[in-house]
């Protein structure tokens, strides 16, 4: 809290949780307080237009232990959570705020549960815009890249007119970033591995959510 200058005002860990007559894992919950200086500087995560640049902030190491991918696909619940580098956490977050305050981003989303591909899908839901993502040349494992839950990462939608100013801020702050692709109309596309109609993706999500 002191390092991030972030006030946590409450917390709880319930060890006796039950949902639908089934036990669930212990669930830590914290409550924090933040201050938005100007409401017109708030930012949501919905894509706004096509042909925007998609900037990935933070390094991807492909951490899959304790990930949603391991839980849902392989029913693996063991392992260590991803490490958190507080310096990167603070610097990356403050750089994202600087970009937002300078009106350079059209949408922003943190990368957490589910990894990169889930964050991109959530940005596409309820819009007509999908993505066209290029795989890194040095990629060793597509699942680690798409579903890894490495911390301190963000996806920014940046218009071409604002790209140079955005990159200048990131370079001045010594932030690791990659331009991983663009937004496009109608389709959610990851290299040659995945191509799905946005409407179909939204329907699949609704079916899951309504039965959750």
Regions found by a protein language model. Name each.
Residues 27, 66-83:
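Gly-rich Lys/Arg/Thr-decorated short loops/hinges at beta-loop-alpha junctions or inter-strand turns
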Residues 65-66, 166:
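Short glycine-/acidic-enriched loop or helix-start segments at secondary-structure transitions
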Residues 31-37, 83-93, 133-140:
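A general structural motif
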Residues 4, 9-28, 78, 101-212:
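Glycine-/charge-enriched secondary-structure boundary and capping motifs
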Residues 97:
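Histidine/acidic residue-rich metal-binding segments in metalloenzymes
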């Amino acid at each position: 809290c002191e390092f991030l200058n972030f006030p946590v005002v409450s917390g709880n860990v319930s060890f006796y949780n039950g949902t639908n007559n089934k036990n669930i894992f212990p669930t830590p919950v914290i409550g924090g307080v933040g201050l938005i200086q100007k409401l017109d500087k708030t930012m949501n995560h919905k894509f706004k237009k096509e042909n925007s640049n998609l900037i990935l902030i933070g390094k991807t190491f492909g951490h899959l232990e304790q990930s949603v991918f391991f839980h849902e696909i392989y029913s693996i619940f063991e392992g260590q959570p991803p490490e958190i580098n507080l310096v990167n956490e603070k610097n990356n977050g403050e750089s994202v705020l600087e970009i937002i305050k300078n009106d350079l981003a059209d949408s922003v989303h943190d990368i957490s549960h589910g990894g990169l591909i889930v964050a991109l899908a959530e940005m596409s839901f309820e819009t007509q815009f999908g993505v066209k993502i290029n795989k890194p040349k040095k990629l060793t494992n597509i699942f680690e890249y798409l579903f890894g839950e490495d911390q301190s990462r963000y996806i920014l939608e940046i218009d071409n007119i604002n790209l140079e100013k955005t990159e200048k801020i990131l370079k001045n702050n010594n932030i690791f970033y990659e331009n991983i692709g663009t937004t496009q109309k109608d389709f959610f596309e990851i290299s040659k591995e995945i191509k799905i109609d946005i409407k179909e993706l939204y329907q699949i999500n609704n079916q899951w959510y309504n039965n959750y």
